[in-house]
Amino acid sequence: MLGTCTVRISLLSFRSGKKTSPHSVIVLRTVFIIGFLVGTLPLVLAQGKTVEPAILECRYLERVVVDTLSGRRVSDTLILKAGRTASAFYSKDLLFADSLKAQPDGQQEFRRLMLLYAKEGRISELTSNTSEYIYQNWPDGCITTRAKLGKEPVEFTEERELPKWTLRDSVKTILGYECRMAEADFRGRKWVAWYSVEVPLSVGPWKLWGLPGLIFEAYDSRMEYSYSMVSISADSSGNVTVFDWSDGKKKYTKVTRQKYLRAYSGQDFVNASKAKEAGLGNMASERKYDLREKDY
């Protein structure tokens, strides 16, 4: 329970803040303001199931090493909507893209934006590193993940496994909050987390939870995956919403966590043609890094 603690706010602008050309500004105003605010928001509400009101909205900068040989990293901004019992975790850019594509003619509009951003060398601003929406404690005692394998919408539900945290004495300040360190071996990686008892919600990014306070920062021991909070807000946090982006024809296919991870890593595709048919390309030969979960 959040209680009466005061949450200080460090707002992050919705877009990246990079300089844009006048043409880009006009296009973004037309598509985003008219298309998103007028058209997308009702669709988001219509295509989402409210679990409960959100107490907090936190944003994290995710960094992932996608080539362990060169050390190349990609980054993404992810949103954590935390309620009293449940939470939702997803990419800001993914939500924008899925919301836009759900509109009438949204697929065509999204392609136009992709072409525009590609010409300007800014395609990463419209793409996400993940297709996952992760819902903690929905249903009760479980974690549900909705994602896509290629173009196939899939869903799997797993027991909400509690990382076995060891609390440490180290302390540092993040966004003005005093945070303490904890460590845990979880899903094949050793994780370090920094949490604050000033915000007594036992949640965090991805599938990390179970500490005496909100997790502000987390990373694995190899620094291949990391999450750093960049903003926290208790004002107008909205709802913890379970989104349904299936188009009515392709409902979510139920899979297991292990099957999803094997498919995502390319192990289920015995040749490139099958992978191509699934819309994944030859992921088995292209992947140069380990998945976040290594216990599959």
Regions found by a protein language model. Give the residues of each.
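Bacterial Sec-dependent N-terminal signal peptides
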Residues: 1-53
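Generic detector of intrinsically disordered, low-complexity, polar/charged segments
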Residues: 12-14, 32, 36, 45, ...
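Short beta-strand element of the conserved SAM-dependent methyltransferase core
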Residues: 34, 60, 182-184
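Extracellular or lumenal secretory-pathway regions
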Residues: 47-163, 168-171, 178, 192, ...
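Structural motif
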Residues: 174-175, 186
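Gly/Pro-enriched, hydrophobic low-complexity segments
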Residues: 180-243
